[in-house]
From Swiss-Prot:
It is found in: Cytoplasm. It catalyses: tRNA(His) + L-histidine + ATP = L-histidyl-tRNA(His) + AMP + diphosphate + H(+). This is Histidine--tRNA ligase. Belongs to the class-II aminoacyl-tRNA synthetase family. It comes from Shewanella sp. (strain MR-7). The keyword Protein biosynthesis applies. InterPro entries: aa-tRNA-synth_II, aa-tRNA-synth_II/BPL/LPL, Anticodon-bd, Anticodon-bd_dom_sf, His-tRNA-ligase, HisRS-like_core, HisRS/HisZ, HisRS_anticodon.
Length: 425
């Protein structure tokens, strides 16, 4: 026997038993962005490597360690996309979507990062994101946060997630704070872990995000970014908080919150949970007003967020919120004998035409009554429709209930659609 080929480490199959939960999550996401009037954008999985070096930043873990990068046959450096924002900006610039226009966009699809695989974190993962362009005011920041809060409400997990909020100010304010933070870190350099020492000059704000307990202890006396904000940035953050208060979205201001990507300014946020251990962040985003120009477009304000679907699915499973996921089949049609096969197929086809939302599975491959009922039960269907020679002669179908103790009954062929519509509504 030939050796079986396995999936690549960190790249998982989503099996038929798992896909209904994924479909439920995806349906909630699509319905939520539709309620806010957002439009879908789809971008290639493979992009020029320079796109991510220029947007994410060359001195980041993603670019330095995690990207899947290769040369094609022309010698061009290409990369499997590690996130969706840069591709969305590239597409917007390329197709003239962002020039003096407002755009509310969303995307969903696979991303790739060469990280250490663990529960809720994979090398191929599925990301859902929202991006808004052309609006610089705090009300749109509030809107994307309201949209994200709606997701949790519709998924039934609002009580299990918390919003953390911060502001990074504008580039000039952040530059002044950066110098003050570097000066502070230099005084404690010998106590910093290796990763923080490496980031101290290239990306010092990321030191604030260190998980090292000793570094966090040192940072207790570090200068605060809030003290370096100008009036405009302070007012933007104050207005955002006022709007969130007005609509009843609770949050916690976290002055240590920074984002792992270089392009963020002003508003940054994360939704976190205590239910997933170390994988606590379930959605993150913020404002990135400089990225469109950085990638060759005109100065354009922008704000958005992204979430990993694997982590959302894991959270729903951890909280045992998967019980209401319906089976893939409503009705199973079985022929009791070869002479009834054509009639059974016709019944199934008619039901699919008259009841488009009814999920009908036909038994194929023959077999005795016991085998067919076993397959019907395994399909998850509510009922099996049995068609034998007697049913054929009388113009009826026998309805056998699979999920309760109701006695089976006969239903006239011409009344079957109405009967099933009432039964499965």
């Amino acid at each position: 026997m030939a050796k079986q080929i396995q999936a690549i480490r960190g790249m998982n199959d989503i099996l038929p038993t798992q896909s209904p939960l994924w479909q439920k999550v995806e349906a909630v996401l699509r319905a939520s962005v539709a309620a806010y009037g957002y439009s879908e954008i789809r971008t290639p999985i493979v992009e020029n490597t320079d796109l991510f070096k220029r947007s994410i930043g060359e001195v980041t873990d993603i670019v330095e360690k995690e990207m899947y990068t290769f040369e094609d046959r022309n010698g061009d450096s290409l990369t499997l996309r590690p996130e969706g924002t840069a591709s969305t900006v590239r597409a917007g610039n390329e197709h003239g979507l962002l020039y003096n226009q407002e755009q509310r966009l969303w995307y969903m699809g696979p991303m790739f990062r060469h990280e250490r695989p663990q529960k809720g974190r994979y090398r191929q993962f599925h990301q859902f994101g929202v991006e808004v362009y052309g609006i610089g005011s705090a009300d749109i920041d509030a809107e994307v946060l309201m949209l994200s809060a709606r997701l949790w409400e519709k998924l039934g997990i609002s009580e299990h997630v918390t919003l953390e909020l911060n502001t990074l100010g504008d580039p000039a304010e952040r530059a002044a704070y950066r110098e003050a933070l570097i000066a502070f870190l230099e005084q404690h350099k010998d106590k910093l872990d290796e990763d923080s020492q490496r980031r101290m000059y290239s990306n010092p704000l990321r030191v604030l995000d260190s998980k090292d307990p000793q570094v966090q202890s040192i940072l207790g006396d570090a200068p605060a970014l809030m003290d370096y904000l100008g009036q405009e940035s302070s007012q933007h953050f104050a207005q955002l908080r006022e709007l969130l208060d007005a609509v009843g979205i609770q949050y916690r201001v976290n002055p240590r919150l920074v984002r792992g990507l270089d392009y963020y300014n002003r508003t940054v946020f994360e939704w976190v949970t205590n239910s997933l251990g170390s994988q606590g962040t379930v959605l993150a985003g913020g404002r990135y007003d400089g990225l469109v120009a950085q990638l060759g477009g005109k100065d354009t304000p922008a704000v958005g967020f992204a979430m990993g679907l694997e982590r959302i699915v894991l959270l729903l499973e951890t909280l045992e919120l998967t019980q209401d996921i319906p089976a893939a089949v409503d009705v199973y049609v079985a022929a009791m004998g070869d002479s009834c096969l054509v009639e059974a197929i016709k019944v199934a086809q008619e039901l699919r035409s008259t009841l488009p939302t009814l999920r009908v599975m036909s038994h194929c491959g023959g077999g005795n009554f016991k085998k067919q009922i076993k397959r019907a039960d395994k399909s998850g269907a509510q009922v099996a429709l049995l068609i034998g020679e007697e049913e054929l002669a009388e113009g009826v179908v026998t309805v056998k209930y699979l999920r309760n103790d109701n006695e089976q009954q006969r239903v006239a062929r011409n009344a079957l659609s109405a009967f099933l519509a009432e039964l499965t509504k």
